[in-house]
Amino acid sequence: MKYLLPSAAAGLLLLAAQPTMAANTGGYATTDGGDVSGAVKKTARSLQEIVDIIEAAKKDSSGKAVKGGAYPLVITYNGNEDALIKAAEANICGQWSKDPRGVEIKEFTKGITILGTNGSSANFGIWMVNSSNVVVRNMRFGYMPGGAKDGDAIRIDNSPNVWIDHNEIFAKNFECAGTPDNDTTFESAVDIKKGATNVTVSYNYIHGVKKVGLSGSSNTDTGRDLTYHHNIYSDVNSRLPLQRGGKVHAYNNLYDGIKSSGFNVRQKGIALIESNWFENALNPVTARNDDSNFGTWELRNNNITSPSDFAKYKITWGKPSTPHINADDWKSTGKFPAVPYSYSPVSAQCVKDKLASYAGVGKNLAVLTAANCK
């Protein structure tokens, strides 16, 4: 099902006018990005202008390079790449071999926020490398080119303390002839790997993506703490996320149309899967493709409470020939440790009924609370 996400208010409002507030991401991230004292605020109309603004912020007034950045940045992006997105949609199978397009935030730790205006759009990604204190909000990413060359929408490499909030990421969830190893035509929506940790992914609308996201790039890239909350995943294939070790807290998400597998908890990781809504899903919680180093999960207050609910919500299970564990008894296999942040989950039913009015772009960063569930 494709969700029609209503706008929180009419008109194209510049979100740069939002007041500064202390970071409360509802998860492991604790960053305000660049929206702090001393921030320089800029407006960009294109990928290249974002790149130029970031590069300028790496130098002081004399032009000397400053390690980690010379000042915090808030970049308001008001560009529109709908024409490129429409052209990509008309030539889906031609996107794989193209060069990827993206903004690289490299070795920038001073703090940076990239904030899209309502009505903006991007046919490019945002890639973080050896950075920290990064916030990406209200950006609409569509049909990223360069799947053969790791053309992710969001990539977080060795970059702690990142908040990905109120974005829309979309592609086409089918296979084109000629892509290798039965791989995807498009790359990931949000990959978090190579030492990245303390990341919150919230209020995003992700649809038509085959491989949604990694937590860790290999069996030795483990140990991160991630939170996913209030996201809508529709018509997706797998990796929600593919978790290699560490801790994942996922609450108040809506999963509709999982075609292969959802949570894949590997390398002795643990996931708290709390107050979510699942429907039309194949293998929504599993551990597979990992020899015997299976992870564990705690299932808490989801719309599914026992196997008797599977038929009602169209939950099905597959049994691969390789070692695996499915949550087909819908029982917890581990106990998640206490989280270091405060959060107030709403009921799974409220997620089903109300989340579409809050997740994604054009919602003026509105959040869903219990008061909205009445």
UniProtKB/Swiss-Prot annotation:
The keyword Calcium applies. GO terms for cellular component: extracellular region. Its main location: secreted. Keywords: Calcium, Disulfide bond, Lyase, Metal-binding, Secreted, Signal. The keyword Ribonucleoprotein does not apply. Involved in maceration and soft-rotting of plant tissue. Belongs to the polysaccharide lyase 1 family. PLADES subfamily. This is Pectate lyase 1. It comes from Pectobacterium carotovorum. The lineage of its organism: Bacteria, Pseudomonadati, Pseudomonadota, Gammaproteobacteria, Enterobacterales.
